[in-house]
Each structure stands twice: as C-alpha cells, then as structure tokens.
C-alpha cells in the first residue's frame, strides 16, 4: 500500500519526466540534436527500464559471438557505480588495468570474462569511442559494443538492441520516479531488435510479449541458463545438489538469481540482499558469514557481486575462508539465436 501511495504522489513528476524525454527524443528524430557517427560499426545493448533485465550477460554473449567469428571487439560502457570520472581504459585487450571500484562491477566482470577485448568506460560514449580509436589506431576493433546506451543518443548505432525483463511486466507501467520506465514505451520503436529477457516456465509474459510485438520490431525470447558453481579460490564445485546455501546479492533483480540457483539444483536455506551496486562493508560480510556459520550453510553469490567484493582483499579473504561460491550464468535463446546472429553479422556489412 505504501508503494502504491508513493507512486500516486509521484505521478506529476513522472508525467513531467516523460514529457522531457519525449521532447528530447523528438529533437533527435528531427535532426535538431545531432548524433555522432562512428567509422567503426556500433552495436548498442540497453534497457528501457531501470533495474536488472539480463543486459550484462547479453553483452558478454555478443562479445563472445564476435570473437568466435574472428571479429575483434571493444566495449564502451558508462561504468555505473565507479569512483573514477571521465574516460578510463579498463582493459587493453591483454591486461586488466582497473578493478570494479574504478571501472564499475559489471564492466570489470565483462573485461575479466573477455580478456582479448578492449574495454573503456566513459560517461560520454562519444569520447570513449574516440579515445579507443586514437589509443588503438594500429589495431582498431571490427565492432564496438555500447553497454547500457539506449537513451545515450549522442552516438549513432548500427544495431540498437533493447532488453526487457519478462519476469516483471509491471516495470513498464509507469515513468520514473513513479515507476521504472526511463522513457515512454513508444521509444521501443527506435530499437532494431527487442530481447524479452529472463523468461521462465512460470513467467506470465504472454501479454508483455504481445505489447512488444505491437512495436513492429523483431522480438526474441531469452532465458538465463545457470552455469557452474565456482569456489572463489577458482575451483569448480563438483556437484550443485550437495550444496545447502545462504544466497546473497546486491543486484537489481535478485529474484532472477534465486531462480537460477533453483534451476541449477542448489538448495537455498537463507537469503540476504543488498542494494544494487552498493559497496560491501566489513559489517555486511561479517553478517553473511555469521548467518552462514550459525546455520551450517555455504555462502553463494552472483559473479558480478564477487567481482565487487574481490576488489577488497580483506573482505574477499574472509569469504574464501568459509568456502564462498559464485554462480556463472549465460543467456540462451529458445527460438531466436539465428535471427540475433544474422543481425549482429549484418552490422559488419554496412
């Protein structure tokens, strides 16, 4: 009831925000505001809502697809939650130069998972692309992937992919700050491809799927496939079923993490959740460890959370000593892999 009352009170602010975003988009559509065109093909992966949609695993999948196709790739991201400002080189395609505190947890994870990929963070994505073009003029990538850039229209893109969370259709009901929409839903018509992410067998996403198809854009369904349970010392868990866990995370949509654990056959006996991108404190880690010890549980978290914690050696060591694990994930596309791959390759033919 409290949240509903707050949403009602915030409706005037949401209406004003929606008008501002609509005007801004109109000015770009009419060419009054200009978008810079990169000489290197650009693929953007973004959201129309705040919160977790499965965007980061999709970026990782796209980079790995290009790499498997023999296409050198670079990532340019805002680096949400980082303590640095301006343009920063996270990875030169050979060395990881910044951790999660200076690059942002999602960006640091993407760089670590794709060690041959150049990764740059920049609030102004145009400056980030221009920096890498100058810095790596002798080995330019064949394609640049923009992470979280659907609303960042100062840079043009050759393929605009938007991810929508199938598990939370209510997220597209209202504009910020009353809801989670970053811009009016009609903005989806600007996308070239829509990914309905995080579908599950029990998710009631038929209505949302129909709404997305009414944009006239291709819609591909995606689900998160749980991977391996990795001990934070780097070793793999022999079997998921033998682990009784305390699941903890500080992400936008923790229910997706819990679903992945259950799908992987991992028993969840207790949970602890923190705010998305919030730095872990010593007291938070001690509370996790204390609860796990009291109940005889193994702490398990997301790969993104572990990258955030690993930047704090003392906290990381505390979790190593109690056998903490993290779960890897990857997206899969039940009926749209070929369409996604076709569009990604068509970008290179421009």
UniProtKB/Swiss-Prot annotation:
The gene is lpxK. GO terms for biological process: lipid A biosynthetic process; lipopolysaccharide core region biosynthetic process. This is Tetraacyldisaccharide 4'-kinase. The lineage of its organism: Bacteria, Pseudomonadati, Chlorobiota, Chlorobiia, Chlorobiales. It comes from the Bacteria. It comes from Chlorobaculum tepidum (strain ATCC 49652 / DSM 12025 / NBRC 103806 / TLS) (Chlorobium tepidum). Pathway: Glycolipid biosynthesis; lipid IV(A) biosynthesis; lipid IV(A) from (3R)-3-hydroxytetradecanoyl-[acyl-carrier-protein] and UDP-N-acetyl-alpha-D-glucosamine: step 6/6. One of its GO terms (molecular function) is tetraacyldisaccharide 4'-kinase activity. One of its GO terms (cellular component) is plasma membrane. Transfers the gamma-phosphate of ATP to the 4'-position of a tetraacyldisaccharide 1-phosphate intermediate (termed DS-1-P) to form tetraacyldisaccharide 1,4'-bis-phosphate (lipid IVA). It catalyses: a lipid A disaccharide + ATP = a lipid IVA + ADP + H(+). Its EC number is 2.7.1.130. HAMAP family: LpxK (MF_00409).
């Amino acid at each position: 009831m409290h949240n509903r009352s707050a949403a009602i009170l915030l409706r005037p602010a949401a209406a004003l925000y929606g008008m501002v975003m609509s005007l801004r988009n109109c000015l770009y559509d009419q060419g009054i505001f200009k978008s810079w065109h990169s000489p290197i093909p650009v693929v953007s992966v973004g959201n129309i809502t705040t919160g977790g949609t499965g965007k980061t695993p999709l970026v990782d999948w796209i980079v790995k697809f290009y790499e498997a196709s023999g296409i050198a790739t670079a990532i340019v991201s805002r680096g949400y939650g980082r303590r640095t400002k301006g343009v920063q080189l996270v990875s030169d395609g050979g060395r990881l130069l910044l951790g999660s505190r200076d690059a942002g947890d999602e960006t640091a994870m993407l760089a670590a998972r794709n060690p041959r990929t150049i990764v740059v963070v920049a609030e102004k994505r145009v400056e980030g692309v221009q920096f890498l073009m100058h810095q790596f003029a002798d080995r330019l990538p064949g394609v640049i992937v923009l992470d979280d850039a659907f609303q960042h229209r100062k840079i043009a893109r050759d393929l605009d992919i938007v991810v929508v969370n199938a598990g939370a259709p209510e997220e597209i009901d209202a504009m910020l700050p009353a809801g989670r929409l970053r811009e009016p839903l009609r903005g989806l018509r600007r996308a070239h491809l829509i990914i309905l992410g995080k579908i599950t067998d029990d998710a009631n996403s038929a209505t949302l799927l129909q709404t997305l198809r009414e944009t006239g854009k291709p819609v591909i369904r995606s689900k998160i496939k749980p991977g391996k349970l990795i001990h934070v010392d780097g070793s793999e868990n022999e079997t998921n079923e033998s682990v009784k866990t305390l699941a903890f995370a500080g992400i936008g949509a923790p229910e997706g993490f819990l679903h992945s654990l259950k799908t992987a056959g991992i028993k969840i006996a207790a949970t602890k959740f923190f705010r998305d991108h919030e730095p872990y404190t010593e007291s938070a880690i001690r509370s996790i460890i204390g609860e796990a010890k009291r109940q005889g549980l193994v702490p398990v978290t997301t790969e993104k959370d572990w990258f955030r914690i690993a930047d704090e050696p003392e906290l990381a060591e505390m979790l190593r000593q109690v056998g903490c694990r993290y779960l890897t994930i990857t997206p899969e596309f039940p009926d749209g892999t070929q369409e996604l791959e076709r569009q990604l390759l068509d970008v290179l033919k421009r």
